[in-house]
């Protein structure tokens, strides 16, 4: 699986999209088990969690254990969001907001149903890339978790692609400003076309 060789790039871009400024060599060093000076421990933990979540995803894909379910998303979230989110490994239990937009994600008591509906809608689309991108977007917009929603959307999107024999989609950190603006517009409208 080619994506396994790209873990450093995937982690680098993911943390930088979250506003955590690590260079590529710093991520390489950190993932080799050496701490990097000048960074908060919490930021380093986020990067390490990303790498661990990728390893788990690759392992699950090899063993045919990747599934588009709420349970699987929560399992992966327990790794990706450990000590980063208010709670990890389960859907949020109260309301959240998204900075920069007036859009309010759905109430917490609807999340399990919304996840199942999202998977049904996504898998009805013909194009595998449209399915994957829609999965990412809807996970980010619905905010199933207190935090780490976009990262989880990327994991589930890429797990779905890899499971179908397609390469991953990596969102380059160099396009952070454009990505953030498009996401804010998407949160407000729910219209996916601009993002595909």
Model-derived features: where do they sit?
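FIC/Doc superfamily catalytic core
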Residues: 1-196
């Amino acid at each position: 699986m080619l994506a396994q060789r790209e873990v450093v790039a995937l982690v680098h871009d993911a943390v930088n999209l979250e506003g955590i400024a690590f260079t590529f060599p710093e991520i390489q060093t950190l993932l080799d088990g050496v701490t990097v000076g000048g960074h908060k421990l919490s930021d380093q933990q986020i990067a390490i969690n990303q790498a661990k979540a990728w390893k788990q995803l690759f392992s699950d894909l090899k063993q045919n254990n990747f599934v588009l379910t709420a349970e699987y998303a929560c399992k992966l979230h327990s790794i990706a969001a450990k000590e980063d989110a208010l709670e990890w490994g389960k859907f949020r239990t109260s309301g959240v907001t998204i900075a920069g937009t007036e859009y309010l994600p759905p109430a917490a008591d609807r999340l399990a149903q919304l996840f199942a509906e999202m998977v049904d809608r996504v898998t009805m689309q013909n194009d595998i890339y449209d399915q994957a991108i829609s999965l990412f977007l809807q996970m980010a917009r619905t905010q199933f978790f207190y935090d780490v929603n976009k990262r989880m959307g990327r994991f589930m999107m890429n797990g779905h692609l890899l499971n179908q024999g397609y390469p991953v989609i990596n969102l380059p950190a160099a396009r952070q400003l454009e990505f953030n603006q498009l996401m804010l517009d998407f949160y407000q409208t729910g219209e996916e076309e601009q993002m595909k």
